[in-house]
Amino acid sequence: MGYLLLEGGAEFGGRMSEPDLRAMELAGGFEAQIAILPTAAAPDHNHKRAGNNGIRWFQSLGAKHVFSVDVIDAQSANDPKLADQLRNAKIIYLLGGFPRYLGETLKGSACWSAAMEAYAKGAILAGSSAGAMVLCEHYYDPYERKLLAGLSLVPNACVLP
C-alpha cells in the first residue's frame, strides 16, 4: 500500500515544495514517474494549462519523468492507454478544480482502477483542493452545496480545503 498526500489549494505556488519533495523521495526519487491528473480542471477547459503547471512544478523540484494524463471525461477515464500510464506511475497527483466532476468522472472507471492498482503496489496518491476532497469517504460540493460520496481512500473523513 502506498501513501496518501492531501494538500490545500494553490498546489504549485511554492508552498508545497517540502511535502512534494518528500513524496518524490518516497516514490523513488527524481526518476519516479509522476502522473498529473487535471480532470477537475476540465469543465472550464483549463486542464491543459493545469496539467502543464503540474509538469513545470515537479520539474522545478528536479523530477525527470512528469506527464499529464488527459482524463477529462467518462470516455477518456476508460481509455486503456491512459489507464496504463496511471498503473505504472509512482505518484498520481489529482489537481484542483470542480470536485463533483472529478469524483464522478473517476468513480468506477478504468483509470481509477489502474490508480488503485498502482496504490496497492506502493504508489503515492496525492490530491490538492478538489483532488484532496474526493479521496475522502465524503466531500462537499460547493457548487451543489451538498455532501457527496467520495472515492473512500480516507474513511470517515471529509476534507474542506
PLM region spans:
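Class I SAM-dependent methyltransferase SAM-binding "motif I" and its flanking Rossmann-like core
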Residues: 95, 101-161
